[in-house]
A protein has these predicted regions:
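Conserved N-terminal helical subregion
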Residues: 1-101, 142-149, 153-157, 300-318
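Conserved FAD/dinucleotide-binding core of flavoprotein oxidoreductases
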Residues: 11-16, 20-25, 60, 101-182
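Conserved protein kinase catalytic core
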Residues: 77-78, 210-212
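C-terminal helical "tail/cap" subdomain of flavin- and related membrane-associated enzymes
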Residues: 173, 193, 214-219, 226-318
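FAD-binding beta-loop-beta segment adjacent to the flavin cofactor pocket
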Residues: 184-211
Length: 318
């Protein structure tokens, strides 16, 4: 439909990048050593005392001044705090992810390619300097309550085959040969949880999970961690929730709108959408307003977070 040069959002030392999430995670944790303890399951959180008391399933109890909850969209810790009052909901979409072995002729291996279709969109982008390409697609698909809770369903060959048969005909050739294929349901947040104890904070998807359209999950997790770190350092943590909630409301609205626009099926509306897109990507004021407020903030906060946590800057390049 059109081209958008994401490098326009770069500065001299802060640049947009694409990479595999596991690569970023390994980079961030490589110098942490044994600081992170794993294998613990929280059974109870008592936040009524001056210090927060955390009970684990192995009968171990710990007390702490601050509790930072970052255990994802299905956060058990968040459920314990809210007494299961705040639950994510199924977004009526499935995500299909994998590494491409066959490359479409119209894909630039050094750029991000977004393809739009009725009730389906997919993105292809480089993972590394070796030319490996990642494939991620979002497909409209209804699931019953039973299917939503059946996690083994999404790895069953019969289910995978049924889903792949529904992808657009023009991409079936290279989707069928995908490596490391994963299909999973997309769950999103419906509301924010304001915790009364100002020493307990949510970050990442535990704070709020979006519909998938801005590729913002990992970026927002890093950004929220950095903002919380700065808030704690300056004794302004009481403002952290309000600041994050306001930012995330904006991103959530735009993510929902993008998903709607990406999945249009009416030919006339699609025709009009494509005309608007061709014009809008050339409008610097629109890009600055609609994308710049999100991407430039992400890039700045992520680069500062990486500098703080590792002591050096991760080389980022599109």
């Amino acid at each position: 439909i059109c081209d958008l040069d994401i490098k326009n959002f770069n500065t001299d030392d802060i640049k947009y990048t694409t990479l595999k999430r596991s690569t970023l995670i390994n980079f961030l944790k490589k110098d942490l050593g044994d600081i992170i303890k794993t294998g613990f399951k929280i059974s109870k959180i008592n936040d009524q005392e001056k210090q927060i008391k955390i009970s684990f399933e192995n009968n171990v109890t710990k007390e702490c001044d601050y509790l930072i909850i970052a255990d994802g969209v299905f956060s058990k810790s968040k459920n314990l705090i809210s007494n299961n009052k705040v639950k994510p909901k199924y977004n009526d979409t499935l995500a299909i992810r994998g590494k491409l072995t066959k490359f479409p002729e119209n894909v630039n291996k050094k750029n991000v390619a977004l393809f739009l279709g009725p009730n389906f969109h997919h993105v292809i982008y480089p993972l590394n300097s070796n030319g490996d390409l990642n494939f991620i697609a979002i497909m409209k698909h209804s699931l019953s309550l039973e299917e939503q809770g059946n996690y083994s369903l999404f790895s069953e060959n019969s289910f995978i085959k049924k889903i792949l048969e529904k992808v657009p005909q023009e991409i079936k050739e290279y989707v069928t040969g995908i490596k490391e294929l994963k299909i999973f349901p997309v769950f999103v947040s419906d509301e924010f949880l304001k915790i009364q104890n100002n020493n307990i904070h949510l970050i990442g998807d535990a704070f709020f999970a979006f519909p998938p359209s801005f590729a913002q999950g990992a970026s927002q997790s890093i950004e929220s961690a950095y903002e919380l770190f700065m808030s704690l350092n300056t004794d302004k943590e009481i403002n952290f929730f309000k600041k994050r909630a306001n930012k995330l409301k904006m991103i959530n609205f735009r993510s929902k709108f993008n998903l709607f626009a990406f999945h249009l099926s009416n030919p006339l509306i699609i025709f009009l959408r494509n005309i608007f897109l061709k014009r809008l990507v050339k409008n610097k004021k629109f890009l600055e307003y609609y994308l710049g407020r999100i991407y430039k903030t992400w890039l700045l906060d992520i680069s500062l977070c990486l500098k703080w946590s590792i002591g050096t800057m991760l080389p980022l390049r599109l």
